């Protein structure tokens, strides 16, 4: 069920950032995000609706040893779920993004499968798929 004001994407949908992360501190949330990202890759084609979905990758930065430990735990969960999440040293981060200032970083996490999607297009594609299957 989707609740919107007056028509689809007229309410809060168009305000959404459209981030499609894999990173999550919870196994269940990571699993749902992984499922969604996989679905978005083919959704436009599956329902014959144009979609702007981009797999851009994302770097998460750690300024402390504790944050790096969290990244290591999350990366382990991700790898177990079939995701590629790489723990990076400050030097490796600099290789990924030469303009990054790394002097105060403990390291980071690189997720090449993070991305973004147009929230309005996503909503319309999901609605079209539902209508095609008899939804109203």
Question: What does each model-identified segment do?
Answer:
Residues 1-16:
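Glycine-rich FAD pyrophosphate-binding loop
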Residues 1-2, 93, 109, 130:
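Hydrophobic packing within well-folded, soluble alpha/beta domains
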Residues 6-8, 93, 126:
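Short beta-to-alpha linker loops that shape the active-site pocket of alpha/beta-hydrolase fold enzymes
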Residues 9, 94-102:
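FAD-binding beta-loop-beta segment adjacent to the flavin cofactor pocket
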Residues 10-13, 64, 71, 119:
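Alpha-helix N-cap/helix-start motif
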Residues 12-14, 51-53, 102-103:
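Short, flexible turn/loop "capping" segments at secondary-structure junctions
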Residues 18-96:
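Dinucleotide-binding Rossmann-like beta1-alpha1 core, especially the glycine-rich loop
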Residues 109-136:
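Helical element adjacent to the flavin cofactor pocket in flavoenzyme catalytic cores
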């Amino acid at each position: 069920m989707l609740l919107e004001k007056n028509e689809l994407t007229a309410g809060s949908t168009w305000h959404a950032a459209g981030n499609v992360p894999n990173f999550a501190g919870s196994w269940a949330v990571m699993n749902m995000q992984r499922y969604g990202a996989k679905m978005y890759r083919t959704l436009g084609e599956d329902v014959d609706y144009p979609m702007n979905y981009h797999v851009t990758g994302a770097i998460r930065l750690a300024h402390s040893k504790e944050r790096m430990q969290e990244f290591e735990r999350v990366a382990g969960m991700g790898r177990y779920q079939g995701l590629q999440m790489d723990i990076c040293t400050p030097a490796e981060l600099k290789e990924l993004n030469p303009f990054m200032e790394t002097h105060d970083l403990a390291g980071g996490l690189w997720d090449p499968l993070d991305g973004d999607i147009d929230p309005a297009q996503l909503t319309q594609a999901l609605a079209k798929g539902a209508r095609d299957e008899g939804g109203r």
